[in-house]
């Protein structure tokens, strides 16, 4: 998150109109908003993990995720056979990009960070949280926590969707929603003049 803040400050003058983060990207976006050193006019966190897990669960889950990434990288054919969806093709491609550069240690460190940090505060002008109905059991506690920190959070729930599925299966819908946010902001800005 610190690197993102530095980039926004150095390259964009400290201001970003819209930011979208899915899952770990949403976690990073939440940290950028927590640091509160740049202006992000519209922030969309899609299924971002905002709460820490119980300590007893962190170890087993991070090793499970590491095994998942390792097997995605080494047994791609098995995963494609098991899951007949291009959603998993995207996941497999990501695993193949990441694993060779950091191996198990990078995956374990990443998941340890995700699973052990809790969002303590958040600042922003227009904050959105998206999730699919098939991931509600995980997303609802995140939403409750976010609403305690930022009561004006706009929640969007996508019927029949799982983790990240709206972006993978319907990228044009995500682009359309982001474009509408930009368009609505432009209308507000020109009406002030």
Locations of the language-model features?
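Flexible "cap/lid" loop of the alpha/beta hydrolase fold
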Residues: 34-35, 40-70
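Short beta-strand/loop motif that positions the catalytic acidic residue
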Residues: 123, 129-131
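Catalytic histidine-centered segment of alpha/beta-hydrolase-like enzymes
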Residues: 161-172
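Gly/Ala-rich beta-loop-alpha elbow adjacent to hydrolase catalytic centers
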Residues: 21-29
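Short alpha-helix in the alpha/beta-hydrolase fold that links the catalytic acid
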Residues: 125, 139-148
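Active-site loop/oxyanion-hole signature of alpha/beta-hydrolase fold enzymes
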Residues: 1-18
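Conserved alpha/beta-hydrolase catalytic His-Asp/Glu region
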Residues: 55, 71-121
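Acidic catalytic loop of the alpha/beta-hydrolase fold
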Residues: 134-138, 164
